[in-house]
Amino acid sequence: MCETPIGCHTPRRCNRFIDSAALIDCTNKTNQREHSPSFSIEIPTTPSRKRTLASSHFQTPTKRIKYELGELQEEKTDLYPNFPAQLKENKKPKLPTTPQTPKTPKRTIQIVTPKSLNRTCNPVPFATRLLQSTPHRQLFPPTPSTPSTPSYNSTAKLSLRKSYRSAGVVGRENEKSIVESFFRQHLDANAGGALYVSGAPGTGKTVLLHNVLDHVVSDYPKVNVCYINCMTINEPKAIFEKIHSKIVKEEILENEDHHINFQCELESHFTQSANELYNPVIIVLDEMDHLIAREQQVLYTLFEWPSRPTSRLILVGIANALDMTDRFLPRLRTKHITPKLLSFTPYTAQEISTIIKARLKTAATTSEKNNPFTPIKSISEVSDDSINVVSQHADETPFIHPAAIELCARKVAASSGDLRKALDICRHAIELAEREWKAQHDNTLSSVDIPRASIAHVVRATSAMSQSASARLKNLGLQQKAILCTLVVCEKTSLSVADVFEKYSSLCLRDRLIYPLTSSEFCDVANSLETLAIIRLRTKQRNGKPQDRIISLLVPEMDVITAVGDIGTLKRFFDRR
């Protein structure tokens, strides 16, 4: 058996032996250990470059620099014992460095902007800061505005708004008695119950419920009333969290199934055995049809709670659909827990006329008490003829001619019976009459010569309300179009009036082409847009502030963009910056 001796090596392994003497010594020791004869085969290989230890470590530029700096001597003496002694003792002299030309110091000039002496460090509120402009960039000086005195017709226009709550309900006496008896019957018996109120839009459902609840709360102070508009809820399951926050008012840790936790907490609260532990609860869910889902489990749960034996929950649902319980909730009839149904029919022409006249007379009484225009006369200056004139005018309908009210009521009753539309027409007619009066006279109104809206004003207001959206947008003013452009830029459906005013002010001050309105002027312009059925203003709570009302567009966004297409000032509202 022939073994390859260690001396026989391949070209790749030959580099492992640094010294030839070490290679011969290793071969001799192997031959002495093995007594059998051996021979070696020499294979021609490529001769490798001979590298000396000193040159291999000091000929490269990098390591030469290390040697010059004196660092290599300390690093290599421990690794290589045979390091030359001369290199340990002697150091090469440092190479002379090229002298550098000294740099001339540059001259720096510091520019300091002078500070204004009138600058104060007091914090400015954000709403005030929006309406302030930079002095050196102001394109036009703000014109000082004279405080405007509220007109005599402002009370009348306020009474014709949709959010106005009158002292009594006109034209719904039968429905009011049914709702009052329902509440009193269940509150006296300490039992739960369910009521479903249906009817077309503008038939007085929400107004009547608010009026009845005010009397119920005054007669039963311990009752807890919870009113929720379901249009403010993103998904049907979120109704449990909304009710829990208003009734139980206890915090629950949120997790993936936090809606189920709120539901279980409410169910245990409404169905506990000891009825004395909690007061009766009345829950009013306006726009209840927004809770309709695929399986309707949320609605079934809500209507099942009042039917429990120990429940003291009174549930009232309000929606437009007349047959919502029969079409979407058929299992309620199977379980014999069908709620009490109450349907509101559309208003007749006589009812609409009666409601408008009652509101205008109430507004006239309020205006006479707070009227700043009526001059105070002494008793000697008042004649018998003036007393007869005052008594004669007291019997007439103020602000609008009775024939004009009848015309408006008949037109609305023939089309839809929506009271809100009739109120908008009458308010717009008063604005038209007031505008004509100010154009012809010295821009003042007096209680002696109040311009009553005539039939011509009602006809013009009706035609303006019945126009297409594009035609109505075309006739708007610059500030009205600016507010609509702001709504399009916001790209959200649930914004309050305060949020839209903040965005509107920032857009006007960004381009400095339109001077923004004040907060009160902004609300007036928004109310005029609501009169033209271009936007919708609705309150989130019963006693909400005007700035907290939710504002939304009733016309397509493309119609707004088309209406402002030829106005370059408003086009910049859509620029992204």
UniProtKB/Swiss-Prot annotation:
<keyword id="KW-0131">Cell cycle</keyword>
<dbReference type="GO" id="GO:0000785">
    <property type="term" value="C:chromatin"/>
</dbReference>
<dbReference type="GO" id="GO:0005656">
    <property type="term" value="C:nuclear pre-replicative complex"/>
</dbReference>
<comment type="function">
    <text>Part of the checkpoint control that prevents mitosis from occurring until S phase is completed. Plays a key role in coupling S phase to start and mitosis. Acts at the initiation of DNA replication and plays a major role in controlling the onset of S-phase. Together with orc1, involved in the maintenance of replication forks and activation of cds1-dependent S-phase checkpoint. Together with orc2, plays a role in preventing DNA rereplication and resulting genetic instability.</text>
</comment>
<dbReference type="GO" id="GO:1905634">
    <property type="term" value="P:regulation of protein localization to chromatin"/>
</dbReference>
<dbReference type="InterPro" id="IPR036390">
    <property type="entry name" value="WH_DNA-bd_sf"/>
</dbReference>
<dbReference type="GO" id="GO:0005524">
    <property type="term" value="F:ATP binding"/>
</dbReference>
<dbReference type="InterPro" id="IPR036388">
    <property type="entry name" value="WH-like_DNA-bd_sf"/>
</dbReference>
<comment type="subunit">
    <text>Interacts with the origin recognition complex (ORC) and is recruited to the ars1 origin of replication. Interacts with cdt1, pop1 and pop2.</text>
</comment>
<protein>
    <recommendedName>
        <fullName>Cell division control protein 18</fullName>
    </recommendedName>
</protein>
<dbReference type="GO" id="GO:1902985">
    <property type="term" value="P:mitotic pre-replicative complex assembly"/>
</dbReference>
<keyword id="KW-0067">ATP-binding</keyword>
<keyword id="KW-0132">Cell division</keyword>
<keyword id="KW-0832">Ubl conjugation</keyword>
<dbReference type="Pfam" id="PF09079">
    <property type="entry name" value="Cdc6_C"/>
</dbReference>
<feature type="region of interest" description="Disordered">
    <location>
        <begin position="30"/>
        <end position="57"/>
    </location>
</feature>
<keyword id="KW-0547">Nucleotide-binding</keyword>
<dbReference type="Pfam" id="PF17872">
    <property type="entry name" value="AAA_lid_10"/>
</dbReference>
<dbReference type="InterPro" id="IPR041083">
    <property type="entry name" value="AAA_lid_10"/>
</dbReference>
<keyword id="KW-0498">Mitosis</keyword>
<dbReference type="InterPro" id="IPR015163">
    <property type="entry name" value="Cdc6_C"/>
</dbReference>
<dbReference type="GO" id="GO:0005634">
    <property type="term" value="C:nucleus"/>
</dbReference>
<feature type="binding site">
    <location>
        <begin position="199"/>
        <end position="206"/>
    </location>
    <ligand>
        <name>ATP</name>
    </ligand>
</feature>
<dbReference type="GO" id="GO:0033314">
    <property type="term" value="P:mitotic DNA replication checkpoint signaling"/>
</dbReference>
<dbReference type="InterPro" id="IPR050311">
    <property type="entry name" value="ORC1/CDC6"/>
</dbReference>
<dbReference type="InterPro" id="IPR016314">
    <property type="entry name" value="Cdc6/18"/>
</dbReference>
<dbReference type="GO" id="GO:1903468">
    <property type="term" value="P:positive regulation of DNA replication initiation"/>
</dbReference>
<dbReference type="InterPro" id="IPR003593">
    <property type="entry name" value="AAA+_ATPase"/>
</dbReference>
<feature type="region of interest" description="Disordered">
    <location>
        <begin position="136"/>
        <end position="155"/>
    </location>
</feature>
<feature type="compositionally biased region" description="Polar residues">
    <location>
        <begin position="37"/>
        <end position="57"/>
    </location>
</feature>
<keyword id="KW-0235">DNA replication</keyword>
<dbReference type="GO" id="GO:0051301">
    <property type="term" value="P:cell division"/>
</dbReference>
<dbReference type="GO" id="GO:0006270">
    <property type="term" value="P:DNA replication initiation"/>
</dbReference>
<comment type="similarity">
    <text>Belongs to the CDC6/cdc18 family.</text>
</comment>
<dbReference type="InterPro" id="IPR027417">
    <property type="entry name" value="P-loop_NTPase"/>
</dbReference>
<dbReference type="GO" id="GO:0043596">
    <property type="term" value="C:nuclear replication fork"/>
</dbReference>
<dbReference type="GO" id="GO:0140530">
    <property type="term" value="P:MCM complex loading"/>
</dbReference>
<dbReference type="InterPro" id="IPR041664">
    <property type="entry name" value="AAA_16"/>
</dbReference>
<dbReference type="Pfam" id="PF13191">
    <property type="entry name" value="AAA_16"/>
</dbReference>
<dbReference type="GO" id="GO:0016887">
    <property type="term" value="F:ATP hydrolysis activity"/>
</dbReference>
<feature type="region of interest" description="Disordered">
    <location>
        <begin position="84"/>
        <end position="107"/>
    </location>
</feature>
<dbReference type="GO" id="GO:0003688">
    <property type="term" value="F:DNA replication origin binding"/>
</dbReference>
